[in-house]
Amino acid sequence: MLDLANMTPKEVRALIGKNEINKPTSGMCKGHIQANLVIVPKNLAYDFLLFAQRNPKSCPILDVTDVGSSEPRLMAKGADLKSDVPMYRIYEFGELVAEVSDLTDYWREDLVCFLLGCSFSFESAMLNASIPVRHIEDNHNVPMYITNIETEPAGQFHGKMVVSMRPIPYPLITRAVQATSRFPQVHGAPIHIGDPSVIGITDIHSPDFGDASLIKEGEVPVFWACGVTPQSIAMTSKPELMITHSPGYMFICDPKDEDLAVL
């Protein structure tokens, strides 16, 4: 059995590129940055860049490719964003039309790729601080929810923020806030702690993306801004084309989580 937690990003990306890994990437390449992916045509790229700049909690930019290039030169020189993500989603005019493991058949020379910070990147810091991460413990995808929180619009792009949730034992909440606040480029501190209904979540057991996590007695749901927000934006804004990673199936970068730490 492969020890994915201790393999290098390049090794894991090679396996993903050969379609030998096809599952959520949480816990893989321990200590390395993971990233959300958004790909749009050049004519929408400035609007999306502006949208991300106006919404840094949910869309912190790590890298942007040249037009027509699928190589993220800052985060993984030599990698190929057409094949090095385990699963992609294709949105056309707001509709999810396909979910694929390779983008070769969908690639166009006018596309621009954005890598956005992902909260998987601060999970190593949480584990190092003895804070449990339920979806890693139970080997499932992190739960994600569309909230009632409006993003700051830019050009064509507008809609609701998506959040990820991790149940945290009540005595460890302060420690969880401290651990994640060190990483603003991968969502940073939580945006909400406690009652899900305050941010428009009516059923904590039915996430919009990912899998439900068990919330045990004495635990509190804690919510972080999430890089799946652009997929909510795609459904609302209905751009001609937006390609993303499938929620939880991230791009694994070469730099380490600690490279993004501010403290």
UniProtKB/Swiss-Prot annotation:
Keyword set, alphabetical order: Lyase
Superkingdom assignment: Bacteria
Main EC class the enzyme belongs to: lyase
Keyword Lyase recorded: yes
UniProt keyword Lyase, yes or no: yes
E.C. code: 4.2.1.-
Any single Pfam family the record assigns to this protein: D-Glu_cyclase
Regions crossing the membrane: none
GO molecular function annotations of the record: lyase activity
SUPFAM superfamilies: PSTPO5379-like
NCBIfam families the record matches: PRK05463.1
Family: Belongs to the D-glutamate cyclase family.
Protein name: Putative hydro-lyase Psyc_1103
Species in which this protein is naturally found: Psychrobacter arcticus (strain DSM 17307 / VKM B-2377 / 273-4)
Source taxonomy: Bacteria, Pseudomonadati, Pseudomonadota, Gammaproteobacteria, Moraxellales
